[in-house]
Regions:
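Generic beta-strand structural signal
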Residues: 103, 120, 160-162
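A common structural junction motif
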Residues: 101-106, 140-150
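Signature for HUH/AEP ssDNA processing cores
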Residues: 1-118, 125-137
Length: 171
């Protein structure tokens, strides 16, 4: 499989992001490993939005190339893969996706995921890089197939970061 462009940031607030290349297999391997954090799922649920952001921010990535290493809308030259945020996934969504998705994909749970309230990230590689103008349309088409109401609006932002997988201590 071809090399995919990816930009890494040490945190969501990083000013400079490192452009790199990865293979699909290497990206999938990286996403299999979660960082265990100290708090329990119940403690995480009780945190403020700011506290939650700090706990789960162990760095992240953008699925494409960033001009000058800046994660600004106008600096995204192209995207190599689709990154979707299913924060309102229905129970059974994960099993259905794994069973029915006909494309190469990786799905991983978010820090706030629970069996009763599934929250997942879905990553799909493109056969070739796509332009920023095409990205939102492709993302909206894909989410419409799976139930657009289950996906957060950030899924359509060309410069949206995805956090690396993190999990509460008892998650």
């Amino acid at each position: 499989m071809r090399e995919l462009s990816i930009a890494y940031g040490r945190s969501s607030s990083a000013k400079l992001w490192k452009n790199s290349a990865t293979t699909w297999d290497d990206l999938c391997a990286k996403l299999k490993t979660t960082v265990r954090t100290r708090e329990t799922a119940a403690e995480y649920k009780a945190m403020t939005k700011t506290e939650k952001a700090a706990v789960k921010d162990k760095g992240g990535f953008v699925g494409g190339y960033l001009k000058d290493g800046r994660r600004l809308v106008q600096n995204v030259e192209y995207r190599s893969f689709l990154t979707l945020d299913a924060d309102k996934a229905q129970p059974g969504f994960i099993d259905r996706f794994v069973r029915e998705c006909e494309y190469a994909a990786v799905i991983y749970t978010t820090h706030g995921h629970t069996p009763d309230a599934p929250r997942v990230r879905i990553i799909l590689p493109f056969e070739e890089n796509i332009t920023p103008d095409c990205y939102a349309a492709v993302a909206r088409y894909f989410t419409a197939v799976w139930g657009i109401d289950q996906f957060d609006e950030c899924s359509y932002r060309i410069n949206q970061l995805m956090y690396w997988p993190t999990t509460p201590s008892d998650g």
